[in-house]
């Protein structure tokens, strides 16, 4: 079992360092605000004219352009989108790093697949909260924390491990627990989870279930409720207590169908394709494809985004959400669309 580091295991070295947070999106705003509220000295690095600049200032944070921010800092956390990181790092970050600095990333993609090259005299680390930034921030404000992974890619100073862990503590993650990993393991498992299960696999499963019912003549609205809308109820149960809690909470009929039908959906053919997806990630094939797609302007990516947005499941979902919102706004005792009884 991996060791879990908690607040009592970790020092406060990060509070003695000047920290640059590059980016002020979902993760950037949470890291910067949590660090500040933990007593750290933080500057947000952005490009001049960024829409996030006034937002960061309104939050009470110091903001400067990226080169200036990096020169000022001793610890630099890169929180720009993956596809924007390589040119920004090459042109604005790397030339301004000093010997003994700590360069941090929240995802290992660009380091693991050699899209950025951190100078050898600079420490290299990873702190990856396992959830979106707005949740990281809200948990911190509630006195709670979000689990995170950490890794040390290079320890040029002999102090990198303690400082990386201290950063994780500063953003509140040690309240929940911090697990050690490597850049390779974090990157490959994260990409696989996104592609085969959480995003790619799940999206395809939801659409396939919806389409199967609609093609069989069932109402699209019922197909949406059964195959998409109720997913949150199931996921919440799994989050609370695993698959066992979910199976305990559903009917015996649903549980029996889980055991008998599930293996028909996820059969050996699906498992083999999942192994192929993992192999493409491990070999760097997916990374190369994604890098080339961005270098070409992302036209294929944007076309897929537009096509998926036009799927019937999106239109039906939007209609049902609007109907639910209308019902929620109706006065008590006066059902929307009907007479008061």
Swiss-Prot record:
Active site: 107
PROSITE patterns: KARI_C, KARI_N
Domain KARI N-terminal Rossmann per the UniProt entry, residue ranges: 1-181
Entry's Gene Ontology molecular function annotations: ketol-acid reductoisomerase activity; magnesium ion binding; NADP binding
Pathway membership: Amino-acid biosynthesis; L-isoleucine biosynthesis; L-isoleucine from 2-oxobutanoate: step 2/4; Amino-acid biosynthesis; L-valine biosynthesis; L-valine from pyruvate: step 2/4
GO biological process: isoleucine biosynthetic process; L-valine biosynthetic process
Reactions performed catalytically: (2R)-2,3-dihydroxy-3-methylbutanoate + NADP(+) = (2S)-2-acetolactate + NADPH + H(+); (2R,3R)-2,3-dihydroxy-3-methylpentanoate + NADP(+) = (S)-2-ethyl-2-hydroxy-3-oxobutanoate + NADPH + H(+)
Obligatory cofactor(s): Mg(2+)
Enzyme class: oxidoreductase
Residues binding NADP(+): 24-27, 50, 52, 82-85, 133
InterPro entries, per the entry: 6-PGluconate_DH-like_C_sf, KARI, KARI_C, KARI_N, KARI_prok, NAD(P)-bd_dom_sf
Cofactor note: Binds 2 magnesium ions per subunit.
EC number: 1.1.1.86
Assigned keywords, A-Z: Amino-acid biosynthesis, Branched-chain amino acid biosynthesis, Magnesium, Metal-binding, NADP, Oxidoreductase
Record keyword Lipoprotein present: no
Residue sites binding Mg(2+) 1 per the record: 190, 194
Residues that, per the record, bind substrate: 251
Family annotation (PANTHER family): KETOL-ACID REDUCTOISOMERASE, MITOCHONDRIAL (PTHR21371:SF1)
Protein name: Ketol-acid reductoisomerase (NADP(+))
